[in-house]
Amino acid sequence: MKKRIISLLLCLVLIVSLVPAAAAADTGDTRTVAVRYASGHGENDHDYEATFTYSDELFTKSGYTYRQDLAEMSLGLAFAAFSSKDSQYSDNYATGNRNFVSMAEQCGFENIQSNKWMFQPAETDSIGINCASKTIRDNGGSYTLIAVGVRGNNYHAEWGGNVRLDATGEHKGFALGRDQALDYLRSYIADTGIS
């Protein structure tokens, strides 16, 4: 009888000890996100849809080693940053960032903003940029996660200057796009009061 009681107590201790590990392993926020995106150049007039799995836990593990889950959600972010097919026409630029907004909201992000180039005709050195932020928790601490989506399709011939090289030094056209993205991120952080 004594052995049974000890065995039951050991089983109970083992089961109870697994509860914190199970709770820590799953943040409980895993969700399927429907991402709409523009595909093709003039071949169609609608956005496509793909699903991705999002969880804040994607950002509590190291990004220094390849992780399929993070790669897939990163692709979803890149897709969402494309301008919606609805914005192809000059009278409909206001919908340019709607796919990014939808994805960010589904993932629980707030402070969703886009630069002016998401809403007006492109220029040779313009680049559309979207940002959103949210607070995530890891190891008992709170951190601000900022999603930055740079438009990579259905961009109305923007960033054409990317092919411009300089006689010496860095790739001038690429540097112009890089600087716009970093400047917009800095202004987003300041505007939203993120520290």
Residue ranges and their predicted role:
Residues 18-29:
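Sec-dependent signal peptide cleavage junction
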